[in-house]
Amino acid sequence: MMDLNLSPAPAADADLIKDTTEATFMADVVEASQTVPIIVDFWAPWCGPCKTLGPMLEDAVRAAKGAVKMVKINVDEAQQIAGQLQIQSIPTVYAFFKGQPVDGF
C-alpha cells in the first residue's frame, strides 16, 4: 500500500548537527544563526564529561526537528576561537542567535 503521509521529511542529521573548524566557524555558526538558533558544543576527545553531554545535546537537537541546530567544535583543533570566546573549561555550550552568543553554560 502506498504511504500518503504528506508531512515533510525530517531533517537529516547532517543538516542539524555538524562539526566545524576555525575556517568554517563564521558560516556554520554566526551566519547560520541569523535564521535559526545554533547550539555550539565546545569539546575535546580526551574530555570524559564531553562524551556524556555531547550525545545528550545531539538527541535534544534531533527532537527539536530543525527548530535549533548544533555545531560541535574541538577546542584542541580550534584554539583561536576557544580563546576569543574565553572558553576556560570544557564541555562549554553556547547558544548563538542573530550572530551573537545569547546564553551558555
PLM regions with names:
Residues 1-66, 79-80, 90-92, 96-105:
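Proteins that catalyze or organize thiol-disulfide redox chemistry
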Residues 75-77:
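Conserved SAM/SAH-binding loop
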